[in-house]
Amino acid sequence: MPDPRFFDSLGPALLSELAQAGAATLADAALGERVITHAAPLDASDAQAITFFSDAKRKDAAASTRAGACFVRPEHQGFLPPTCAALVTGRPQAAWAAAANRLHAPRRHEAGAPSLHPDAALEDGVALAPNVTIGQGASIGRGTRIGPGVVIGPGVVIGRYCRIGANAVIGFAMLGDNVAISAGAVIGEAGFGAALGPRGMVDLPQLGRVVIQDNVTLGANSCVDRGAFGDTTIGENTKIDNLVHVAHNVRIGRNCVLAAYTGVSGSTVVGDGVAFGGKAGVADHLNIGSGASIGAAASVFKDVPDGETWTGFPARPLKRWLRETAWLSRMAGGRGTRG
């Protein structure tokens, strides 16, 4: 269930209504009166949730889902348990997006509300520069200093003794104590998710949050996207440079450092004490082990074990990269060839 501090519930809705919204067909029309209250992922659903299944590799998750309903391709209906109503469509993700938008809406600043919402809670010693906007239900801890032009969305929690730079935007997020956010940083915007619908590409709703733990630094113009369902997490004492992008559902551990232009793709898990050189790129759904180092401009497409240093394109262990680079240098220079 999306966090009600950040998302308004528009439900419940009848299954027949959600099938129509997603341009899907109920496999069993008798289930059209089933009540659905929320959207959820396949493996974290309950009887009042609607989900989708589009990848046969996840058939085990489909077989064990507790969802009340699931958008599914015709050839995949048999993977669902009998308790889950099948909504048949050729585009399950796009259909689910339409249903999720019927059930949930991101909370935004109220039209005409004062810049400091009367329902926001500020502890003693909070310092606000000019032109700050703070939304309904936001909470800001003692001693926090907020720069000019900052926008803090409804429900956001900011701990004590934080420093928020000019024109930063923070939404759908919870920040710990002594967090430093530099100018122009954006926290909690929608992650990048899209699917092909009947009329072209559609955005997939992003119903998660951002959690930033104590003593984190986030550089200027860096972006941390909120999760698609769960949380995007930055661990304690992690330091992030300017112009870094952390995608949705990424989990970064404690005491990591990310240099400028680093990009970490969705759902990747980064252990503790990991270092990223400038312009490093990491593909989605990977695991970067604790104590690993990723070289500058490296492009990581595989899991990196604990404590290893990888670099290059595609990234590989440092010693292997050095051997290959030395060999290529010899070949390019003509040494080691005959004739």
Swiss-Prot record:
EC identifiers of the protein: 2.3.1.191
Pathway field: Bacterial outer membrane biogenesis; LPS lipid A biosynthesis
Keywords: Acyltransferase, Lipid A biosynthesis, Lipid biosynthesis, Lipid metabolism, Repeat, Transferase
SUPFAM superfamilies cross-referenced by the UniProt entry: Trimeric LpxA-like enzymes
Subunit structure: Homotrimer.
Functional summary from the UniProt entry: Catalyzes the N-acylation of UDP-3-O-acylglucosamine using 3-hydroxyacyl-ACP as the acyl donor. Is involved in the biosynthesis of lipid A, a phosphorylated glycolipid that anchors the lipopolysaccharide to the outer membrane of the cell.
Family, per entry: Belongs to the transferase hexapeptide repeat family. LpxD subfamily.
Name of the protein: UDP-3-O-acylglucosamine N-acyltransferase
Organism the protein comes from: Caulobacter vibrioides (strain NA1000 / CB15N) (Caulobacter crescentus)
